[in-house]
Design a protein with these regions (language model features):
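N-terminal secretory/targeting leader peptides
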Residues: 3-6, 10-116, 135-136, 140-328
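A gly/proline- and charged-residue-enriched helix-loop-helix capping module
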Residues: 113-134
C-alpha cells in the first residue's frame, strides 16, 4: 500500500484520511536529453517508479526523456527546470560555470586518479560545497550527482598518442573556460558548442574532434564519423540532478525526503550501469571499425605536463576552500 506524504508513513504509522485537496496528485515531470535506453533515462524512471510505489495516486510522475526530440537544445534543460516547466532534470556541471564560476573547479584536468576517488569527492565535501554554491545562485535544489565519468578524445584525422598529435585540431568542448583552456594548452583549437550544434558540425566535418565518455560518443552516433578514439581520461564530469526549488520546497516533508532517497538509489544504479555502458560502447566502436588508443604511462604523463600551467591559473580563479578539497 502506498504511504502518505507525512514522515510517519516511513515508520509504518497510520495516516489520517486525506482531504479532497490532498487527493489531487502532485505532478512531477522529469526530463533529460538522451534516449530512453540510456542509464540516465533509466535512472529517472527508477526514481519515478519508487515514488509511485510509495505514494500511489498522491503523485503523478511523467517523463520527457529527450528534450532534443522536441526541438530543444541540451542546455535548455537548465531554464526548463528553473522556470518550473520541468520539475526535475540533469545536466553536466560545466553548463553552470558561466553563472557560478567556482563550479568550474571540477572541470580541471586530471584531478581524480580513478573513479572511486571521484565518486567519493562528489558524494562528500566537494559535492556539498558545489551544491551550496549552486543553490545560492539558482532556483534549484540539488539532490545528487549522476556520473558522466571520464572523458576521451575522438576524431576523424589521426590517432592521438601525445599532445603533439592534437596540434591544430578543432575540438568541440562543453561551455567551460577551464575545458577550453585545457585544450589550448595541448595545441588544439577548442570550440564551445551545445550538443545539437556539435553533432551537426561533426557530421558535416566542420570540426575535427570531440571529447566524451565512450557511452555518450556511441549514444550520439559520433563513432560513425570518428575513427580514432584515445583513452585520455582528461576530465571527470558529473551531472547535477536539480529540482525546481519552489515546487520542491512546497512539497510535504515526506515527499521531499522520499525524493532524496530515490535520487540516492538512482545515482548508485546509474553509476553501476555506467561502467557496463562504457564497456559496451568500446565494443561497439571496435566492431564498427573504430580504433581505441590506450595511452602508455609516458604518453599520459606528456598530457599532464602540457596542461600543468592551468593549476597555477586556477589558484587565481577559484575559492581556496574548493582548491584545498582537490589538494591544489
Amino acid at each position: 500500500m502506498a504511504g502518505g506524504f507525512g514522515t510517519a508513513a516511513h515508520a509504518g504509522q497510520s495516516q489520517p484520511a486525506p482531504t479532497s485537496a490532498a487527493k489531487r496528485p502532485i505532478r512531477i515531470l522529469m526530463g533529460g536529453y538522451g534516449p530512453a535506453t540510456t542509464g540516465f533515462s533509466l535512472a529517472l524512471k527508477r526514481m519515478g517508479d519508487r515514488l509511485e510505489a510509495q505514494f500511489g495516486d498522491l503523485v503523478d510522475v511523467k517523463y520527457v526523456y529527450n528534450i532534443l526530440d522536441l526541438g530543444y537544445r541540451a542546455d535548455d534543460i537548465l531554464w526548463l527546470v528553473e522556470d518550473g516547466v520541468l520539475t526535475l532534470g540533469y545536466q553536466s556541471s560545466s553548463y553552470l560555470t558561466d553563472r557560478i564560476p567556482d563550479v568550474g573547479v571540477v572541470d580541471l584536468p586530471f584531478i581524480f586518479p580513478d573513479t572511486a576517488t571521484a565518486r567519493a569527492a562528489m558524494d562528500g565535501a566537494l559535492g556539498r560545497a558545489l551544491t551550496t554554491r549552486i543553490e545560492a545562485q539558482t532556483n534549484y535544489r540539488i539532490t545528487g550527482y549522476f556520473e558522466n565519468g571520464f572523458r576521451h578524445v575522438s576524431n576523424h584525422v589521426r590517432p592521438i598518442h601525445t599532445p603533439a598529435d592534437m596540434k591544430g585540431m578543432t575540438i568541440r568542448v562543453l561551455p567551460s573556460k577551464v575545458q577550453a583552456r585545457t585544450f589550448e594548452l595541448v595545441g588544439a583549437t577548442p570550440k564551445i558548442m551545445d550538443l545539437s550544434e556539435a553533432l551537426e558540425a561533426i557530421k558535416a566535418g566542420r570540426i575535427d574532434a570531440q571529447e566524451n565518455p565512450f557511452a555518450n560518443t556511441v549514444t550520439y552516433g559520433v563513432h560513425a564519423f570518428h575513427r580514432f578514439h584515445s583513452m585520455t581520461n582528461h576530465f571527470y564530469i558529473s551531472r547535477p540532478i536539480f529540482v525546481h526549488r519552489p515546487s520542491f520546497d512546497a512539497w510535504p516533508t515526506g515527499l521531499q525526503e522520499a525524493l532524496r532517497e530515490a535520487v540516492r538509489d538512482a545515482v548508485a544504479f546509474q553509476r553501476d550501469l555506467h561502467i557496463k555502458e562504457e564497456e559496451e560502447a568500446m565494443a561497439t566502436i571496435k566492431k564498427q571499425g573504430g580504433e581505441i588508443v590506450e595511452l602508455t604511462r609516458d604518453e599520459l604523463k606528456a598530457f599532464v605536463a602540457a596542461v600543468n600551467p592551468i593549476y597555477g591559473e586556477a589558484r587565481g580563479q577559484f575559492s581556496r576552500d574548493l582548491l584545498a578539497l582537490l589538494n591544489l
